């Protein structure tokens, strides 16, 4: 079913079990984040970390997908976004399980003793270029605040041996990110190439890395079928979240 009906209200996005206000966040709720939150492997996880939490979307999606015993830490550098994430989480069914931290992840990590089974991030990927309208949007879009080597290092410092570190990136940038991760000792375990329809080349890639070596499973996801409605595969992946699916 095509999500033609608007699910925007009060400058946010309504899902089946929660609402995400994002009017004070530089980066809004979008398909990339929804894909990542629905795709990341959660079987057996006990502790999750969301790096660059923004509006809290990924933390909320993980909370919906996991048991009541799972604790989620959401770290966001920008204070307005972190405050809005906290408000979104407070209004959700999982407020007691999600901890929002207004902090620089590189500093926050050094103070942690716990390790995470699942680390998730929808990271910046633009190199410095065209000036953004606000410093907050520039921070969210560009890798100047947290570049990819630093992101991979942060994840490596706090992941369990069998844990997964999951990201979503544009296809070509994802290929470069994979090369970098492999050179730093990570192992690629899951890869899903995402295309808008069968006729188009993949434009996004979902990646799951682990410190532990193992077989890499790869597949392809097409978002829309020939009729321009959501494909069966995309519907199966996201229907627990989309309000009109």
Swiss-Prot record:
UniProt xrefs under Pfam families: MTS
UniProt EC number: 2.1.1.223
GO molecular function: nucleic acid binding; tRNA (adenine-N6)-methyltransferase activity
GO biological process, one term: methylation
Cellular-component GO terms for this entry: cytoplasm
Protein name: tRNA1(Val) (adenine(37)-N6)-methyltransferase
Subcellular location: Cytoplasm
Source organism, top-level taxon: Bacteria
Organism: Shigella flexneri
Keywords attached to this entry: Cytoplasm, Methyltransferase, S-adenosyl-L-methionine, Transferase, tRNA processing
């Amino acid at each position: 079913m095509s999500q033609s009906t608007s699910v925007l209200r009060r400058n946010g996005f309504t899902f089946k079990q929660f609402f995400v206000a994002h009017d004070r966040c530089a980066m809004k709720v979008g398909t990339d984040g929804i894909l990542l939150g629905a795709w990341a492997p959660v079987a057996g996880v006990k502790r999750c970390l969301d790096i660059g939490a923004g509006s809290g979307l990924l933390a909320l999606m993980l909370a919906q997908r996991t048991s009541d015993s799972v604790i989620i830490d959401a770290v966001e550098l920008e204070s307005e976004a972190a405050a809005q994430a906290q408000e979104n989480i407070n209004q959700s069914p999982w407020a007691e399980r999600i901890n929002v931290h207004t902090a620089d992840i590189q500093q926050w990590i050094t103070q942690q003793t716990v390790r995470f089974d699942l680390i998730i991030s929808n990271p910046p990927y633009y190199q410095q270029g065209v000036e953004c309208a606000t410093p907050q949007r520039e921070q969210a879009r560009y890798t100047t605040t947290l570049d990819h080597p630093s992101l991979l290092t942060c994840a490596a410092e706090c992941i369990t041996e069998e844990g997964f570190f999951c990201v979503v990136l544009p296809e070509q940038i994802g290929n470069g990110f994979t090369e970098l991760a492999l050179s730093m000792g990570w192992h690629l375990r899951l890869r899903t190439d995402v295309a808008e329809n069968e006729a188009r080349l993949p434009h996004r890639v979902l990646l799951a890395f682990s410190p532990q070596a193992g077989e890499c499973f790869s597949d392809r996801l097409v978002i829309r079928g020939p009729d321009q409605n959501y494909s069966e595969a995309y519907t199966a992946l996201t229907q627990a979240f989309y309000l009109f699916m």
